[in-house]
Amino acid sequence: TTSGVSGITSSTGLPSGVTASYSANTLTISGTPTATGTFNYTINLTGCSDDATGTITVFAPPGGISSNLKLWLKADAGTSSTSDAADVNTWTDQSTNSYSASGYSAGGKYYENGINFNPTITFDGANDYYTISGGIIGSGVNIDDAFVYYVGTFDTDNTQMAVFHESCSDAANGGENSYWKFQREADAEIFYNKGRANSSYSLVRDDWGGASSQPYLWTAVAASSTSTPQGTNKYITRNDNLILANNGTSNAEGNGGDFHIGANNTGGHDFDGNISELIIYEGVSSASDEDKIQSYLALKYGISMGTTSSTFSYLSSDGTTIWTGNATFQNNIAGIGRDDNSGLHQKQSKSVNYGAILTISTQAIAADNDANTTSLDDGEFLMWGNNNASTSSYADLPTGGGYTGRLQKEWLIDMTGTVADVHVEFDLSDLHLNLAGDEASDFYLLTDADGDFTSGATATVATSFSSNKVTFDDFNFSDGQYFTLATKQSAPGGIASGLHLWYNASTQSHNTGTTQATDGQDVDNWHDQSGNNFDANSNQGDASWDEDG
């Protein structure tokens, strides 16, 4: 409140979407910011010799959900170094609490392209954890509800590895030893405890069901009521698939113990893997809010949520459905898109699932998402998922147009807004098919309105074919469109019609896995080149490969 001022002469430094006004001796700054960051403003008041100055900090929270955000560590912000493979000595919380996590010794290492072209912090399991001194609960404060969202990997089997740990007390039970912790156990269980140590009231744990080094989105919940998205006090999900849910509550009162990331309170249970993002809310998330937070993380990191039997619809921060759960195509979901209210701008994506062959980008694929200099508009999304058909299966197509067949695997597009002129790339390295195509003109992107492709499909010839990668530049998809890759199928004498089985000693006769056998090596499996998947595997003893025949 001021006096003797008649109005505002000028203002500078306010974030876009925020304005200053003066009326009835009161200066008001208001609006909805459309940009994030720290803004130092100056307002010159008419009739006053002193300017009004101040600082406004605007941040875009995960999924647009800022209420009760307790901790937000992400590898693409707040790290003391952004040089590839460099030590990260400090990691700063992106919530308004601005906790600073200090690395023990050198801390973890920063990698620019960790998960789906986004950065990650890598821990080697040897005392490279972080500490927030004094913890984040607050001494003498009870944390009733704690919702944890974590994206990363566990890279070692049969080892206890803590994502985070803070010692606390159970004041209601005489200060009994308690802790707050999320980790993977040595017996391949996932473990979340908030309260009394290993009590059924505070603990939820079960077989984790995952694979080492595979990125997942974990959600771990311990709440004082059952008004949670799962209807229970406690639960853990992996990629929205329920691991375990149960009831029971326990007090977790802060006692000034440090909060550790990548180890327990004594430095044990060292973490070996990657942490790309760790988010904690102190409060109960609604089902809609949880979906928004998970959708933000899943799109950013190329994580496929749900299953064909339990589908998941991805939401933007304003509640718009950007991927509608699909009982056929809820596999290997990925997407590009921009959501300013989440601080999300994903410009190139590939599913992190094993065997994914498709990448889509706003331009030729860059080294990482940050290096991609193009831009989408806020609210634009292009999502895709596939039917989970084998990449070793081939479907015949009517002759003509330079191709004889297509992959059995096909994809579905779900578009919000208009995302145009995208770069589409198929990596054929893992295909167990003997394709005859050896130049761009041999490959076609087939699009279709119904996913049948036998009639009414549109074929677009590839832009390039190099290093086993087929690319299509400046391609425009339509919402609800199906697509797949078509080419010539190699066949004996060029006759593919009616081909039922074809073993060729010179192609895909493997000693182990997908490694081509060399002279004198045993052949463990021999892949059928017909596209019908009649692969032959050794049951007892092995035939050997002779390069001279």
What does each of the following model-derived ranges do?
Residues 28-36:
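Extracellular/luminal low-complexity segments enriched in Ser/Thr/Pro
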Residues 37-48:
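A short beta-strand micro-motif common to beta-rich folds, especially ectodomain repeats
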Residues 49-60:
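C-terminal edge beta-strand
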Residues 60-100, 277-367, 422-439, 472-542:
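GGW-centered surface loops in extracellular recognition modules
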Residues 64-69, 134-148, 205-216, 252-253, ...:
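Extracellular/lumenal carbohydrate-interaction signature centered on repeated Trp-anchored short motifs
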Residues 92-131, 148-160, 167-251, 263-265, ...:
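Extracellular glycan-interaction surfaces
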Residues 245-246, 253-285:
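Extracellular glycan-interaction patches encoded by glycine-rich segments
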